[in-house]
């Protein structure tokens, strides 16, 4: 049986699928990355599953980074056609923008947060992450788009996950595992120093919380795919 296609838009090389990368083929998907701003992104439109990962740019940066406008248009096409799409962090923000919601500077979150599913979220894939703190790192946030269903919040940010048809968007980072984390702290060294983060303490938190988060994240992914 042929694998289905999973096309992933990646904004920086060190922000990849993390713990999801090995799991997606087991769930029946062949993964192909497209590099934002470099590759032709049109294959994303017709993929069986589209995933949009995070990155340091934002919806408000479209004037400097034309890929933002292109991605929003491609995502809108997929959402209008109810093609399964999964957005992570920036991916959530781009999905929200594609649905006409406001996206901009918001509450800065960095570290481990309890993701609090709504009553609707508790009967879907988001229930899988209710028991373990998940990793967050973002400064922008989105309002809930019209027609979307709110699935989860944190104490500080009201829209941490929503669904729209067969698509799912999450503001937190379920894909992060220890190897991904290590690439992130190297790639974001300047920002971490500027905001006074102790990398050894940050790493120790990952070592403590990472295994439970990865376990919950894989269950989230499996539940999402099973529901398509």
Q: Where is each model-derived feature located?
A:
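Acyltransferase
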Residues: 176-228
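Short N-terminal binding/cap micro-motifs at the start of the first secondary-structure element
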Residues: 15-19
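Cofactor-binding loop segments of dinucleotide-utilizing enzymes, especially the Rossmann-like FAD-
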Residues: 9-11, 36, 90
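Extreme N-terminal starter segment of soluble prokaryotic enzymes
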Residues: 2-7
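Flexible gly/pro-rich beta->alpha loop and the following alpha-helix that scaffold active-site loops
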Residues: 22-86
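Catalytic nucleophile loop
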Residues: 78-102
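Glycine-rich His-Gly loop
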Residues: 9-12, 52-56, 139, 172
């Amino acid at each position: 049986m042929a694998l289905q296609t999973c096309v992933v838009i990646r904004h920086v090389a060190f922000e990849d699928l993390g713990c999801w990368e090995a799991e997606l083929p087991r769930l029946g998907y062949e993964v192909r990355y497209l590099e934002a701003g470099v590759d032709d992104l049109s294959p994303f439109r017709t993929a069986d599953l589209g995933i949009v990962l995070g990155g340091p740019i934002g919806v408000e940066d479209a004037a400097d980074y034309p890929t933002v406008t292109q991605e929003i248009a491609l995502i809108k096409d997929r959402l209008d056609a109810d093609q399964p799409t999964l957005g992570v962090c920036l991916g959530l923000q781009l999905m929200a923008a594609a649905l006409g919601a406001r996206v901009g500077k918001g509450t800065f979150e960095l570290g481990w947060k309890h993701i609090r599913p709504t009553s609707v979220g508790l009967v879907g894939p988001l229930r899988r992450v209710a028991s373990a703190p998940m990793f967050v790192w973002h400064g922008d946030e989105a309002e809930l788009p019209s027609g979307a269903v709110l699935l989860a919040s944190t104490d500080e940010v009201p829209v941490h996950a929503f669904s729209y048809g067969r698509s799912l968007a999450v503001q937190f980072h379920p894909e992060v595992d220890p190897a991904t984390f290590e690439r992130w702290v190297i790639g974001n060294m300047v920002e971490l120093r500027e905001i006074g983060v102790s990398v050894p303490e940050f790493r120790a938190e990952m070592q403590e919380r990472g295994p439970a988060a990865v376990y919950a994240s894989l269950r989230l992914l499996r539940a999402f795919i099973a529901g398509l």
